[in-house]
């Protein structure tokens, strides 16, 4: 798995990198076909304080790319919200992919039973 983390107007410190990596382990545990991950953390000068810290992620899966973004006044809270959103999308995608495979097997078994 390729992992890239970058920051705009922000230095990526080792504790921040480790925090992001530990949060993303949850995603890999749910779905093991992750090809690459690119994370962008940014600090902007918005008038609204709750939108100053920005985090986005591009998750490259086998057959699909997922993009998620989150804003918050605390960068760690933005990362938490980002991973929660990403987790929901990955689980939904995994269910969709596995659901199609199960339906195909179910129809094949039903067709085989009808031929007998």
From Swiss-Prot:
UniProt family annotation: Belongs to the HPF/YfiA ribosome-associated protein family. Short HPF subfamily.
Any Gene Ontology biological process: negative regulation of translational elongation
Keyword check for S-adenosyl-L-methionine: no
Entry-linked Pfam families: Ribosomal_S30AE (PF02482)
Described function: During stationary phase, promotes and stabilizes dimerization of 70S ribosomes by the ribosome modulation factor (RMF), leading to the formation of inactive 100S ribosomes.
Tagged with keyword Hydrolase: no
Transmembrane region(s): none
Molecular function GO terms recorded: ribosomal small subunit binding
Gene name of the encoded protein: hpf
GO CC annotation: cytosolic small ribosomal subunit
Family annotation (InterPro entries): HPF/YfiA_ribosome-assoc, RHF-like, RHF/RaiA
Protein name: Ribosome hibernation promoting factor
Keywords: Translation regulation
Subunit: Associates exclusively with 100S ribosomes, which are dimers of 70S ribosomes.
Top-level lineage group: Bacteria
């Amino acid at each position: 798995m390729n992992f890239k983390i970058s920051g705009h107007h922000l230095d990526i410190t080792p504790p921040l990198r480790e925090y992001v990596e530990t949060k993303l382990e949850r995603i890999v545990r749910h779905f093991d076909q992750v090809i690459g991950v690119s994370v962008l953390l940014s600090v902007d000068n918005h008038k609204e304080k709750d939108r100053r810290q920005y985090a986005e992620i591009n998750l490259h899966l086998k057959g699909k790319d997922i993009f998620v973004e989150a804003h918050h006044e605390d960068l760690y809270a933005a990362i938490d919200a980002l991973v929660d959103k990403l987790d929901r999308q990955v689980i939904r995608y995994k269910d969709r992919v596995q659901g199609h495979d199960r339906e195909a097997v179910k129809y094949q078994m039903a067709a085989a039973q009808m031929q007998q």
